[in-house]
Amino acid sequence: MLTELVDLPGGSFRMGSTRFYPEEAPIHTVTVRAFAVERHPVTNAQFAEFVSATGYVTVAEQPLDPGLYPGVDAADLCPGAMVFCPTAGPVDLRDWRQWWDWVPGACWRHPFGRDSDIADRAGHPVVQVAYPDAVAYARWAGRRLPTEAEWEYAARGGTTATYAWGDQEKPGGMLMANTWQGRFPYRNDGALGWVGTSPVGRFPANGFGLLDMIGNVWEWTTTEFYPHHRIDPPSTACCAPVKLATAADPTISQTLKGGSHLCAPEYCHRYRPAARSPQSQDTATTHIGFRCVADPVSG
């Protein structure tokens, strides 16, 4: 069963920020047309339905192309994906390779490797999906992925606040999204009841009634990443064509939005609508998922 769509009216808003990270600038006015967005990220159960109906094989389940990785040992080109692995203690936060490992056999069915499964995670957002996997699901569903502008417009929920829920990170001490609780990357206190992804819909909706726009998993958009916003005319801010057909291009990075359960104030203060991060199209990880959008039905 596909996720319920929430109709958004479209309009103009101030996109970006100059308060946190340089790639979020400049602040600029963007206009998006009316569209509909899925209320929550695509879940494991929904992605399983897609795979069952189509026989689709994700990027993480396919051997790596030796031509794209010259000099890499053939034994290291087996199917797999990136898995977050907590460190034993405090580390230099400038080197992400200390807490990310390439794990053979990791994929959406086995997000942490061959010995893991999703038997008790049907309602969690699907992870270990690369960009073409998200595009394929969206096409099957008769939908598409959002542009970065559409995603940020939806996440803001009709406000100009710093966070999707207001200007305070923890209003009244309340945790508003599934983000890292403890000291990154070695101790997660599990204060929210989960260490890792949480079932969708466990936190308050934003002003548009959308769930999990912030935290839990980063979400793919169709917008290629540049180290600052590219200012496009308002008429082109929505519905950018998806250039990808059936294969990922590791030389192209897409823009991720929303932050994830691995975001912490001291490392990745990106659990905000304006925040953005690059990710190569061919990479699947334990903290990236997606949701779809749809255009209004004409008639």
From Swiss-Prot:
Stretches of the chain forming a coiled coil according to its record: none
- Summary of the knockout phenotype: Cells are viable and do not display growth defects. They however show reduced sulfatase activity.
Q: Which pathway?
A: Protein modification; sulfatase oxidation
On whether Acyltransferase is a keyword of this UniProt record, the answer is: no
What PANTHER family is this protein classified in? FORMYLGLYCINE-GENERATING ENZYME (PTHR23150:SF19), SULFATASE MODIFYING FACTOR 1, 2 (PTHR23150)
Q: What does this protein do?
A: Oxidase that catalyzes the conversion of cysteine to 3-oxoalanine on target proteins. 3-oxoalanine modification, which is also named formylglycine (fGly), occurs in the maturation of arylsulfatases and some alkaline phosphatases that use the hydrated form of 3-oxoalanine as a catalytic nucleophile.
What name appears for this protein in its UniProt entry? Formylglycine-generating enzyme
From which source organism is this entry? Mycobacterium tuberculosis (strain ATCC 25618 / H37Rv)
Q: What is the lineage of its organism?
A: Bacteria, Bacillati, Actinomycetota, Actinomycetes, Mycobacteriales
